[in-house]
């Protein structure tokens, strides 16, 4: 990795806790005023940004937490677990059921705030995606040919997509008669991302590669060369770059000037032979955060390749990474249960 003399931000601008269980996911609520960490022991830890000394532990799932998302409303979260529960965590720390799928795992959750009270919640359970309104009333079930492995709404909330074996499927959420668009490519697809302008989707594949489809003309996009499986995908705010894990650097593919076909990606913060496990593009600027298998966390400027060290390689492999909506806070968690929030807001 590029050498730098700057101190790690964890020591100068961070607050952390040892939570004693694998950090499955971390997210900020839509207001950006609170962060949540979902753990492998079924608990969810909440932290108000205005009071980061106070970490609240909630017992949310009877088994492991498997998925976490901000809710449709500003101050709540949605979680899924291997106890079959899809649950809402309220701004007052109250936990309530949206749905109970009993013995079936809720492995993927997503939400969209919608307009004028028309927010949507989605849960991936086996081969089905369940769609709920913001009040938790079930709207429809969307079937897939195999287990859902990734789930995301597009930017406008008009479509939802899921990855699965042999491809991905896109659905219009408001369609009275569901006629999904099926995107086919043989193999095991394990993660899913939608381009910010809605014209492309990308999946990670079991065979250490990415596959994409340009929706306007069906053009396939193949992105390969990874030494490990890609677990994390993140488009930059304007969709110019797709950041990905799975190599000993953050790998960014160009999605401008016709897309990534025939073009080499750029690699940031690489060279040490340690696999990048998580990426998170900044929501406002051309920057990307990356977490590595040795616990290192860095922030990279895409245009200059300048690297800012966030956390040293001391606390276990990075398993979760997320920005607040305004990009002033960065949260991360590790397989060893270490969790932290970095304050990047301007200081007087």
Feature map (PLM): residue ranges:
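WD40-repeat beta-propeller superdomains and closely related acidic/aromatic-rich repeat-like regions
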Residues: 1-348
